[in-house]
Amino acid sequence: MMYYLYSHAGINIFQYITFRAGAAFFIAFFLALLFMPRFIQWARNQKAAQPISEFAPQGHRGKANTPTMGGLVFIGATLLASLLCAKLNNLYVLAGLAVILLFGLIGLRDDAVKVLNHSNAGLSSRVKMLYLVLAGASVSAALFYFGMEDDLYIPFNKNPLLSMGIVAILFWTLVMVATSNAVNITDGLDGLATVPSVYALVSLSVFVYIAGHAGLSSYLLWPKITDSGEAVIVSAALVGALIGFLWFNCHPAQLFMGDSGSLSIGGFIAYMAIISKNEFLLFLIGSIFVIETVSVILQIGSYKTRGKRIFLMAPIHHHFEVKGWAETKIIVRFWIIALMSNIIALLTLKVR
């Protein structure tokens, strides 16, 4: 809507992505601050709290009545801010909003099952995976159909490794499903997934803006993805909404994001990596998500093959809890790792 004040009323400042991204950030931030307390009160009245797993560390027992599904609020804030500030006829805006909405709805279904059944077990892993694959494949197929570049790039190389063709749909789907699950796994402590997600989105927004800017992409030898820069507005809105959510999610959390939040965040982070041609650099940008996921894979693999556990508990943040680390210490140290990883990722811009 804001862009059309430029195209129809001639208000020049509204043509700039940077201005509209800033506006989207603050709109989403204040919407989250405004509606989050109301949602918390409503969720408490409805007893919409996710039951704590019997296998969780002892310290988690005190979180038993904390409301969940906070993702609904920051998804809503993101969508509204994006609708107000972004060009709604842009492929990359529409696809990004579709990712947030589809993955958020899958997470909402999972959250609802947990709350209604008073159980930590939501949708079966097979059903949830099927939904995620269908959502990821739908968006990936749309991107491919409408001409999204299918070249695969690796860090530090200005030339594409190969052209994936229709296989790009499978690859992009894999990236979205894997990343959404990785963020979901990480979301186990207050604010642990929120801040690394903000770092990742900020870094990826820089890459997407460069990819959509003819001058910058040429200067930095970065793949040019025409019109992709508009997706930065959606990303800025999500960052603003997440910071508003963090106000209530920091330790001790008044609200959890739930699967509705973590799956939508993970799906959108993957989407931003895909349209900026950073699928492999995502391992560095999302280092905390990778570490958490690998710890689970190693734990399961070791137990099934050797009958022994590598960690005291997985994901690895629980390992440190069992070792006696304070929750806040684990969270802040993981934030530091995420910050350093994203700084390094941004430095790769000049290494081509």
Curated annotation (Swiss-Prot):
GO biological-process terms attached to the record: cell division; cell wall organization; peptidoglycan biosynthetic process; regulation of cell shape
EC category: transferase
Known catalytic reactions: UDP-N-acetyl-alpha-D-muramoyl-L-alanyl-gamma-D-glutamyl-meso-2,6-diaminopimeloyl-D-alanyl-D-alanine + di-trans,octa-cis-undecaprenyl phosphate = di-trans,octa-cis-undecaprenyl diphospho-N-acetyl-alpha-D-muramoyl-L-alanyl-D-glutamyl-meso-2,6-diaminopimeloyl-D-alanyl-D-alanine + UMP
Keyword line: Cell cycle, Cell division, Cell inner membrane, Cell membrane, Cell shape, Cell wall biogenesis/degradation, Magnesium, Membrane, Metal-binding, Peptidoglycan synthesis, Transferase, Transmembrane, Transmembrane helix
Domain of life from the UniProt record: Bacteria
Enzyme Commission (EC) number: 2.7.8.13
Membrane-spanning residues: 16-36, 66-86, 88-108, 129-149, 160-180, 191-211, 228-248, 255-275, 280-300, 329-349
NCBIfam families membership: mraY
Protein name as annotated: Phospho-N-acetylmuramoyl-pentapeptide-transferase
Organism: Wolinella succinogenes (strain ATCC 29543 / DSM 1740 / CCUG 13145 / JCM 31913 / LMG 7466 / NCTC 11488 / FDC 602W) (Vibrio succinogenes)
Lineage: Bacteria, Pseudomonadati, Campylobacterota, Epsilonproteobacteria, Campylobacterales
Gene behind this protein: mraY
